């Protein structure tokens, strides 16, 4: 395989597999998109609709239009945007609810920074596609809330009630602990700010991007292991022995993307070198049989192959190859794509990607769509490959 063949195959996969799957889920009766498809590929039109999935679908169709320029994609983005504003937006207290029922009535009014970040990411992309001032105004309102309500002197508070009173950070916590701060949420704030900056070129946002990159360099990156810490206390001290290989490799290319828009040459050089070290460590430690292991927690390695981890690994290793010209990264890209085609893509006519494979590559009976299983990772993988090659 060479890069031209890779690009051609991924373009075909995006257009013939991923896009039609998500277009089919447009909910014409209740708004938004059907938010649950079981392992049996049966959609549940009565399933609750989540902020993360709704925002990611908005981002996906907006980015499709911005990159591939097909008018149909705007219609699908509009559909997601209208439901997001009608059902998730808290007009009284501002911000967006975590979850609504299938008709759009709020059933979980918590505000989580992770969810607000994806609203910001989606609205910024939608504004680029449509130039609708309302969408940009909302994006800037969310940005202002994040900076004025969530931020403190050592990072960002993450979970709140509907009136923005801080709560225990339950939504993104794992491994039997409750964290105050998470690398995952901070990464998606950086990602969202980068997208907002490229929609506005507001210089104040550029400064916040730089501050977040410094936070990654000084508090989140572990120079002893070349991994990223996962969970922190409120002072940004790491609180668990855990490595998320998927987040490590995803962070390398998202941070490299953010580095393009700051002016601090010393930071650009240092962080770019760190990102390459992280990519090399992930390749060395977690790349096995053409695919990426999931995580290591308290010394125990989880060898399941998760859909989003493989998608982010392909982009991350392609980015590392384009920076370094080291053949080992390109080899990993080609092997990952073969693995994805052979094992992760659901070859049933109505299927998309399996959520998870066990260490023998047998699909786990998990949904193909739910509040987290979305077109953001694998759809973006396709779009990044098409853009970069």
Swiss-Prot record:
Record keyword 4Fe-4S present: no
Temperature-related activity annotation: Optimum temperature is 70 degrees Celsius.
Keywords: Isomerase
Comment on pH dependence: Optimum pH is 7.0.
GO biological process per UniProt: carbohydrate metabolic process; N-acetylglucosamine metabolic process; N-acetylmannosamine metabolic process
Keyword Isomerase found: yes
Reactions catalysed: D-cellobiose = beta-D-glucosyl-(1->4)-D-mannopyranose
SUPFAM superfamilies with a match to the protein in the record: Six-hairpin glycosidases
Signal peptide: none
EC numbers, comma separated: 5.1.3.11
GO MF annotations, alphabetized: cellobiose epimerase activity; N-acylglucosamine 2-epimerase activity
Class in the EC hierarchy, top level: isomerase
Similarity comment text for this entry: Belongs to the cellobiose 2-epimerase family.
Chain's role: Catalyzes the reversible epimerization of cellobiose to 4-O-beta-D-glucopyranosyl-D-mannose (Glc-Man). Catalyzes epimerization but also isomerization for beta-1,4- and alpha-1,4-gluco-oligosaccharides. Can use cellobiose, lactose, cellotriose, maltose and maltotriose.
Complexes and interactors: Monomer.
UniProt name for this protein: Cellobiose 2-epimerase
Species assigned in the record: Dictyoglomus turgidum (strain DSM 6724 / Z-1310)
